[in-house]
Amino acid sequence: MAFTVSQLSEERFEKIAYKHDRAVNAWEPINVTGLGPLIPVANAEANQLCVYYRFGIFKFTVAKNNTIAAGEAVYYDSVNKVVQDTPPAPGTGFYLGKALSGGTGNPTGTVSVEVSLND
């Protein structure tokens, strides 16, 4: 899987139960109007109740050749399943949060940054 995210800290995590109108994959962020970015903790079919993280600190893979500095705004590219420091094209991603660490993406997708969700 090209996308990696893991819970890094026990600081201020908020979980909510929510039914999304489309199927979701565990740990792949979605953006919900009125709620912002949510991270599902399990795979779920459309309109199935699932638990999501609404706030917290998570680790994401950085887009190839993209540099993210600590403190920068971070955007999720839902097509390539990576994060970057510039907004993706309309309909292909969304604002995720602020970077707590920095890094530059490489061809193997092994560089990651910590992101404070909804920050």
What are these regions (language model features)?
Residues 1-119:
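Surface-exposed, low-hydrophobicity beta-strand/loop segments enriched in small/polar/acidic residues
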